[in-house]
């Protein structure tokens, strides 16, 4: 990692310092991809969220994995903001895209056990409907 940019990031955020101390290996892997220099597309964010969680069936592991992913992305966004590598509109869009992706995967993860326990959600017209969050 670029030492000067890292110092700016750590001075800007105690949270970034904490995340680095816990998840340094992940952060170095993430940094190796693009040095946190490029914005993430909506598709990239959805892909990384889905791919990180797709093989997990245990709720505890799933929750831990999404929390780690959130911390990694937050570190990236703090880095980009502290080093003036991202504008406010792009940062806001990426945060929003991550929230949307997290809701989608959480809904998909929760649906199977809910259907097994309660059956498919059915509307007043007796047609199966999507689980609404």
Segments and roles (model prediction):
Residues 1-133:
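Non-catalytic regulatory/linker segments of enzymes
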């Amino acid at each position: 990692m670029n030492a000067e940019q890292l110092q700016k990031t750590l001075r800007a955020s105690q949270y970034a310092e904490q995340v680095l101390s816990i998840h340094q290996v992940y952060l170095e892997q993430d940094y190796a991809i693009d040095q946190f220099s490029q914005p993430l597309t909506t598709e990239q964010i959805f892909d990384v969220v889905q791919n990180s969680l797709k093989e997990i069936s245990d709720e505890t592991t799933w929750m831990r994995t999404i929390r780690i992913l959130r911390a990694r992305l937050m570190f990236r966004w703090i880095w980009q903001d502290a080093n003036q590598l991202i504008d406010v509109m792009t940062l806001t869009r990426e945060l929003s895209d991550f929230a949307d992706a997290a809701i989608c995967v959480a809904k998909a993860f929760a649906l199977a056990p809910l259907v097994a326990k309660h059956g498919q959600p059915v509307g007043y017209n007796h047609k199966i409907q999507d689980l609404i969050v």
